[in-house]
């Protein structure tokens, strides 16, 4: 994992704006044709990791369907929370929405800042801070993407998220 998008300031601003725990997260982003490997994983890592930033850990199962223009993935958490990821073909913007029981807040990712914000996290880590993303969270994100691939192959059936 190495997406810079979870560190985009707009995501934290949306989390702060909802005034409580995020119960629903919605993220959208690009789905191009990968030069190698799986396109949903190659491009989807950004949207999946943005969802993790909104929701935290605890994904239990994933359902995904390929609708042609987009792959739509739903992620169920064990406590009633859920997330939606739209991986949109030939669209190169990223953003989403955080929702609590009180309100919703939308965000767009400012692509002019994405590497700057990632480098700030890397610098802090090299200066002794804890890693900004744990190994467990990294694994869960990858497991969510693999579950999405399995779900698409299984006609949208729910696939459990493998745990580390």
What kind of feature is each model-predicted range?
Residues 11, 47-48, 115, 119, ...:
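A general structural signal for well-ordered alpha-helical segments in protein cores
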Residues 86, 108, 161-162:
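Short linear motifs in exposed loops
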């Amino acid at each position: 994992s190495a997406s810079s998008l979870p560190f985009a300031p707009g995501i934290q601003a949306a989390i702060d704006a909802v005034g409580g725990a995020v119960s629903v997260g919605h993220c959208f982003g690009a789905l191009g044709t990968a030069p190698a490997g799986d396109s949903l994983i190659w491009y989807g890592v950004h949207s999946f990791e943005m969802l993790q930033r909104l929701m935290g850990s605890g994904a239990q199962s994933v359902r995904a369907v390929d609708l042609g223009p987009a792959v739509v993935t739903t992620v169920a958490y064990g406590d009633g929370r859920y997330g939606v990821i739209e991986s949109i073909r030939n669209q190169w913007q990223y953003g989403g929405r955080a929702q609590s029981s009180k309100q919703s807040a939308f965000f767009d990712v400012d692509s002019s800042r994405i590497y700057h914000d990632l480098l700030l996290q890397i610098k802090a880590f090299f200066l002794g801070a804890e890693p900004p993303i744990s190994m467990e969270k990294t694994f869960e994100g990858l497991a969510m993407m693999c579950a999405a691939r399995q779900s698409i192959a299984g006609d949208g059936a729910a696939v459990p998220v493998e745990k580390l």
